[in-house]
Amino acid sequence: MKVLILGAGGIGGYLGCRLGAVNCDTTFLVRENRVEELEKNGISLHSELGSAHIQPKIISESNDTGHFDFVVLSCKAYDLDSAIESVRPHLDKETVVIPFLNGVAHLDVLDTEFGHDRVAGGVAHLAVTQTKVGVIQHLNNIHKFTVGSRHEEQLHKLEQLSHYWSKANLGFFISNNIEQDMWDKFIFLSTLAGATCTMRSSIGTILETSYGESYIVRLLNECMDVARANSREPNEQQITNYRNQLTEKGSTYTASMLRDIQKNSKIEGEHIIGDMIKKGIRQKIKLPCMETAYTHLEAYELERIKKTST
């Protein structure tokens, strides 16, 4: 099974490094200016669950290397359009696209571009950062990847994929209801980003405040209301797990969006919290806490744009 991963940092770099360490046929598609450095130094992963180093197969957009059985996307939502054009030459009618993007809005975009029968679903529970090109730091002890079929023709290929990926040092699962899993994480991530970005603090610090836990729980309840109104009844066990993470005293957990804010970088506010609000508005759901969080993120983006344009 030939797998193409777009990018060698973050989720894609972590996944590819784990797969490469057990000799799965994995290729990274990267920018031209990163090819030489990655070919020279390889990809290193530092993790308490086991570190790894590989000399990866690398291609750039100028290479014509044929088609792949699977293409993995884990880009930021605002880079999705360019990501689609980068991987398009490497797809044929049998290729399955596995997106590990945040939220759910990207599914409609990918279905339009490649066809519903070629786009699977994916959920990654992973906190990593790229400290420099080719060096990935795992930030906790969670590395769970879940994929699932959204069309009956994908199921057999995903089962074949499981045979290879289950050998790697990561948690790999096949779901029989992947879109619900994506919605459950959408609820969690919207709550996590809404709380930690608005307060510019970790979950643990927010919980030390007078009304922090109340605010987090209200965010969570608003997101669950949106899911139910869109015929996506949250999975009770999964939401319990998420609620426990969101109310864990002393937790250092933050959303990656907050780390982007701290670096004065572009953020996925519209794709995650903005999309949750849009889906709520269509169903006439009131979302005062989410609206506050989104206003904060929009204000950040406006200030960032003003600073970069002067």
Feature annotation, model-predicted:
Residues 52-135:
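Rossmann-like NAD(P)(H) cofactor-binding subdomain of soluble oxidoreductases
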Residues 89-90, 113-118, 133-185, 190-236:
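Internal alpha-helical scaffold of NAD(P)-dependent oxidoreductase catalytic cores
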Residues 33, 78-79, 104-105, 153, ...:
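Short alpha-helical
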Residues 1-51:
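NAD(P)+-binding Rossmann beta1-loop-alpha1 motif at the extreme N-terminus of oxidoreductases
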Residues 17, 21, 85-89, 112, ...:
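Short, well-ordered alpha-helices that flank and scaffold nucleotide-derived cofactor binding pockets
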Residues 217-310:
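NAD(P)-dependent Rossmann-like dehydrogenase/reductase catalytic/cofactor-binding core
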